[in-house]
Amino acid sequence: DFGAHAEVLARRFPPGDHPDAEAWAEATRSHQAQLLRTQIELLRRLKYRPSGGFALDRLLDGAPAVSGAVFDHLRCPKPARAAVAGACAATLVVAWPPPSLHGGRGERQTWVSVVHDGREPLDPARVTAELVVAGVTRHWAWEGRVEADSVIDVGGITCPVGSSTAEATLS
């Protein structure tokens, strides 16, 4: 038995779709990191609505397991640990919805926000974005003041997408 989440992962990530067990495990760990980062960023963007925080169902594994923990049974960090730490930075730039959630043709749209938990405002603040879709790169930049303990929407990104399978990278 490798933990309560093994059946769910096998259903969502069929092991037969990967060349070996390590490739399958890496795919599931990568998914966990992306999922936690996206969820935490969204909750932080909401700030104090509805509850002002998030919780992990478990921090570490007590034995070898397929689980949602961010540390394994040897107390070594899983990739999700870095994703959680990054999503908890005092100042965070968030794109919502993330480009990875776009599934169709037409235009890819996302909104860019700054979450700032610092006690002092950021002034001046500069946010830059680079979006690469199917090898085409576009840039955006925004400047202004970010108040202490605030969330501010700084701008939007719209980019045409010619294919539903076009890969997008936003940084």
Give a label for each model feature.
Residues D1-P124, L131-V132, R138-W140, V146:
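Substrate-binding clefts and catalytic carboxylate motifs of secreted carbohydrate-active enzymes
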Residues G144-I152:
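Short proline/glycine- and polar residue-rich coil/turn motifs
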Residues Q109, R126, T165-T169:
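Short, conserved beta-strand segments of beta-strand-rich sandwich/propeller modules, principally
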Residues V114-H116, V151-D153, T158-S171:
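Terminal connector regions
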Residues T128, H139, G156-T158:
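Short, charged/polar low-complexity linear motifs in solvent-exposed/disordered segments
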